[in-house]
Amino acid sequence: MRGQSVIYYSPMDLYYFFVFACFAFGLGCCIASFLNVCIWRLPRNESVVSPPSHCPKCNARIRWYQNIPVLSWLVLRGRCANCHEPISARYVMVELLGGVLFLLAYLQWASGFFLRTSPLLGLQPFADIWTVPVCWLVVSGLILGSFIDLEHF
């Protein structure tokens, strides 16, 4: 391995890398949860602000602790807490997709920042920190447009 330099990272560097990766995934799931509201309501010309989230079958209001992305769907086993009717798996799939895509955008930037090379998909690492939020915005728009198209047209 002559001629190659080895980069060592402190445990704190790896800790921050992991914390920010978890943050990116969680943020992606939360944004995608809101996108689910938009996917359902925008084609119907309904407000995305009010009324609050509710079951599409019985119209029972969904409480805040039943509205946690991915986890609530799993805890409730994909059913409404009130009427026990099935809730579409699309909701959790969109949330997971948002989380994974936000995580991949962060890892693409972080791999260049921490590792100085980008093993992910062989792409060049992102140049600056503002690129990641822009990628997140683009990903959000693509998820919204794609699922509205799949669901309603």
Indicate where each model-derived feature is located.
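A membrane-topology feature that recognizes alpha-helical transmembrane segments
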Residues: 3-152
